[in-house]
Amino acid sequence: MPFDKPIVHVIDDDEAVRQALAFQLGSAGIEVRTYESAVAFLQVAPTVHTGCIITDVRMPELSGIDLLRRLRELKHPVPVIVITAHGDIPLAVEAMRLGAVDFLEKPFEDEVLLASVRSALDQGDRDQKRQTERSNIEARLAALSNRERDVLKGLVAGLANKQIAYDLGISPRTIETYRANLMIKMQAASLSDLVRMALIAGVLDSNES
């Protein structure tokens, strides 16, 4: 069952730490799931699309650093906060290099934890919205004809209708028709909105002609 609500996924081999973090976050009204190992979390990782992850660095079987590497390979979208021992700066730096959004040194205050989690949840929410928008735009692009895509590329490149018509060997009036169809199919409110969506989807990066 997919996790669609913003949930904090706590990963730590120490049960006392898991319970303490769950209590701290739960007291702030944040929903929590706990896992005794990175391996246990990876089993459900494909169903986790929102929220954030809090993981200890030093764990048996699979460390927090190893988990970050796995998540990076999977292109997993959920932000990760890493918990490190006091003074364990090299591991913290490695974690950030692998994509962690923050690290917390033990011991840390409740306020520090909550601030970090809320920031990660906000980032995750923004990332999810961007991904959803991109997916929707790509679906609309897939419904365009090859000619409509050619016209769209011309518009995104800033070409005038007459120039696009000349390049494609058709009349400017036909370009106007294609342009009107593009606005409808792409659900664009304006030409600038159409161009914005095309840029998000990387239309100019396409090698199609």
Regions found by a protein language model. Give the residues of each.
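Receiver (REC) domain active-site loop signature in two-component systems and cognate sites
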Residues: 59
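C-terminal output helix
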Residues: 88-90, 104, 108-117, 163, ...
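Active-site residues of response regulator receiver
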Residues: 56, 84
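Acidic catalytic/metal-coordinating carboxylates
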Residues: 36-37, 63-66
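Conserved acidic segment of CheY-like receiver
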Residues: 2-17, 21-25, 38-39, 53, ...
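Acidic, metal-coordinating helix/loop segments flanking the phosphotransfer/catalytic sites
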Residues: 34-52
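Basic, Lys/Arg-enriched C-terminal extension of HTH/homeodomain DNA-binding domains
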Residues: 180-209
